[in-house]
Amino acid sequence: MMSILREDEEGTLARLFTTPTDRTSILTGKFVAVFFTVILQGIVLMVAGRVAFGIHWGNPAGVALALLGQVIAATGLGVLLISFVKNTRQGGPVLGGGLTTLGMLGGLFTANIPGGMPAAFNAIGTFIPQGWVLKSWRMVLDGQTAGDLVVPFLVITAMGIVMFAVGAMMFRKRFA
């Protein structure tokens, strides 16, 4: 997603906008590229986890749903966060800060604390994609079926689509 900022700074984005291609289509193209890159990263990490550490990821259909939901949410969140950034220098701090904060609120840093976190803190995760992604992976690793993962998958996917749509609207206003 940083490529959009780089193209804006280098002037190539302005040239893209002079073509008959809709701005949302340009953003969707970036989204698709990131989507497939993140899927590939997930697969590589899962294979490495299996080979290096013997991790059994669970039911393949459940794994596919969890990974697909995670990727949709991650790419949608990436579009949303990058829409707040004005140049490449701001990209690292905004993306890093946003992802770290949401990861903490979603329970990614506290998932293995003995006794867990207070209920109010855990409730925050139900409003954040990272909380639902964590829930779906826990379900997969606990051996639940793909059918059990439908609700988390739909919630994660809906969040990803909404974040993408909001980010796309912000980009449309910015580059109108």
Which residues fall in each region the model found?
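A hydrophobic alpha-helix feature that marks transmembrane segments and, especially
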Residues: 1-12, 83
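Junction motif at the cytosolic side of a transmembrane helix
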Residues: 4-5, 80, 141-144, 155-176
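Membrane-interfacial segments
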Residues: 8-9, 52, 56-57, 85, ...
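Alpha-helical transmembrane segments and their short interhelical loops
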Residues: 23, 27-95, 100, 147-153, ...
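Membrane-interfacial helix-loop-helix junctions in multi-pass membrane proteins
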Residues: 107-163
